[in-house]
Structure formats: C-alpha cells, structure tokens
From Swiss-Prot:
Protein keywords: Transposable element
Name used for this protein in its record: Protein ORFg in retron Ec67
Lineage summary: Bacteria, Pseudomonadati, Pseudomonadota, Gammaproteobacteria, Enterobacterales
C-alpha cells in the first residue's frame, strides 16, 4: 500500500492555525531511479520558501521529502490557496498559430 501523500501543487499555501504563515512551493522534483521497480513508492522533493515573493533572493529556502512535507502540512494545517503570481503554469498556455503563446482561461 502506498502511503506517500499526493504531489503538492506549485503555489501559495496558508496555515489554518496562523494565517500569517504563508509559504510558496516553488518546485517539486520527482526522483526516478534507474533501478526502481513498479512496486517502489513514488519519491519527490518539495522546494519551498517563506512568504509569497519568489523573486526575493533573501527568502529562506527549504527542501522536504514526502514524509517531512506531509508532517509539515499536518502540523501547520497548511491549505493550498492559489498559484503563485510569479509562477509559470504551462498548462494555461498553448502555442498560438501566429504569435507565439496564447493564454487559455
């Protein structure tokens, strides 16, 4: 039975306990080993920063494995609020016929 939590979304998370605690998940790296068997559990690393400003070079960054991430989410009662303003979500863009990118809502 796979007890690894689902892969987190990129974007802003807010604590239900302390609404001033806001973090931004900036990246999720899925680790795929060459010798992995189909029965192996999914492993990933969650990269996040304190606050919402991904362009803030002074923001402290963190990296958590799935177990650490789930413990953090549960202890702080983090809930996903929205995608980051600075983040690029390729699912919302498609190549336009004439002018590069076009946005889909």
């Amino acid at each position: 039975m796979n007890n690894i939590p689902p892969i987190p979304q990129l974007g802003i998370y807010v604590s239900k306990i302390d609404p001033t605690l806001r973090i931004t998940v900036t990246d999720v790296d899925i680790v795929d080993g060459e010798d992995d068997s189909p029965d192996d559990e999914l492993f990933y690393l969650v990269h996040w920063i304190e606050g919402e400003d991904e362009s803030d070079m002074t923001a402290m960054g963190f990296e958590l494995d799935p177990v650490e991430w789930q413990a953090f989410v549960e202890s702080e009662q983090l809930v996903f609020e929205r995608e980051s303003v600075h983040g690029f979500n390729p699912r919302k863009f498609k190549l336009g016929k004439d002018s590069g990118f076009s946005h889909e809502d």
